[in-house]
């Protein structure tokens, strides 16, 4: 009976940890001077990363599948003209965007220091 109860407790603890959402909000205001309100949302449970900037329009507002590695989180956004790779270093919280242009065969990188921020309090869900 004790083993059954112990097993049930361990199972419940495991299920409760799975139910906890692993969403991290990062404020990264220095990646693009036109987007000082840039928020990066890393959703580990769904395996996605979102960039949200109300002031920027559609250029920096997107969600993409992300890889959550032990030292960094990476994702990409490709268009006809550009291939962009984003990464966040888990230790330093530095966001890096590397853009490759097929037309000019050049690569350009930008970085921004980020801070962990809280989700907006007015959100109901």
Regions found by a protein language model. Name each.
Residues 56-88:
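Contiguous, well-ordered beta-strand patches that form the walls/edges
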Residues 1-7:
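Positively charged n-region of N-terminal signal peptides that target proteins for export
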Residues 23-48, 78-90:
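Short, solvent-exposed loop/hinge segments that bridge or flank secondary-structure elements
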Residues 14-18:
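N-terminal signal peptide c-region/cleavage motif recognized by signal peptidases
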Residues 20-27, 47-50, 67-76, 92-96:
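Short, hydrophobic/aromatic-rich segments at coil-to-beta transitions
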Residues 104-125:
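Edge beta-strand at a domain terminus
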Residues 40-61, 94-106:
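N-terminal glycine/threonine-rich, aromatic-flanked beta-hairpin/loop signature
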């Amino acid at each position: 009976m004790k083993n059954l109860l112990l097993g049930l407790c361990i199972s419940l603890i495991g299920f409760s940890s799975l139910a906890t959402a692993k969403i991290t909000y990062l404020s990264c205001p220095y990646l693009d001077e036109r987007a000082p309100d840039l928020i990066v949302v890393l959703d580990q449970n769904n395996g996605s990363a979102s960039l949200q900037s109300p002031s920027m329009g559609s250029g920096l507002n997107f969600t993409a599948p992300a890889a959550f590695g032990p030292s960094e989180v990476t994702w990409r956004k490709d268009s006809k003209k550009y291939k962009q790779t984003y990464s966040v270093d888990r230790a330093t919280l530095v966001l890096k965007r590397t853009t490759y242009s097929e037309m000019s065969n050049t690569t350009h990188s930008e970085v921004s220091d980020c801070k962990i921020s809280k989700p907006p309090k007015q959100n109901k869900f």
